[in-house]
Amino acid sequence: MLLQGTHRIGRMAMLLALADENESPVLSIPKGWKYCTGKVGSMNSQKVVAAMETAAKSNQVIETDVYRETHALYHAIMEALYGVTRGQIQLADVLRTVGLRFAIVRGTPYDGKKEGEWVAVALYGTIGAPVKGSEHEAIGLGINHI
């Protein structure tokens, strides 16, 4: 089981999330891999999770009727949110809001087929008090097997 150097799923997700709208990251997405990107802003962590899950389903990154795919995506999203929120996913309860760009990538990062598919979720943006100018940059990455 070797992680393929050209198939670093987390790195690809991070580069996609970090790219501004007017720039495209120089990436070679491996054949058969799927991804989507988007933006979400809220004081409600449930809305953040729902927006990313909806994007993944709408862009056929995960199958809507397969529970294990939704479950894997959920855990990758939560892991990425832990990074953005420094381990405390509360937002509105502690008067914090986020404005994030996200990328969700699905693929096979290992050289052995038995290792199966994985999903990576990258988040980049700002977190802070719900007052313009009172935020700072934050980043998070979550990776889970499907």
UniProtKB/Swiss-Prot annotation:
InterPro entries, alphabetized: Regulatory_HutP, Regulatory_HutP_bacillales, Regulatory_HutP_sf
Gene Ontology MF: a single term: mRNA binding
Keyword annotations from UniProtKB, A to Z: Activator, Histidine metabolism, RNA-binding, Transcription, Transcription regulation
Gene3D superfamilies to which the protein is assigned, alphabetical: Hut operon regulatory protein HutP
GO biological process: L-histidine metabolic process; positive regulation of gene expression
Pfam families named among the record's database cross-references: HutP (PF09021)
Subunit text: Homohexamer.
Cited function: Antiterminator that binds to cis-acting regulatory sequences on the mRNA in the presence of histidine, thereby suppressing transcription termination and activating the hut operon for histidine utilization.
Similarity section: Belongs to the HutP family.
Name of the protein: Hut operon positive regulatory protein
Natural source organism: Bacillus cereus (strain ATCC 14579 / DSM 31 / CCUG 7414 / JCM 2152 / NBRC 15305 / NCIMB 9373 / NCTC 2599 / NRRL B-3711)
The organism's taxonomic lineage, starting at the top: Bacteria, Bacillati, Bacillota, Bacilli, Bacillales
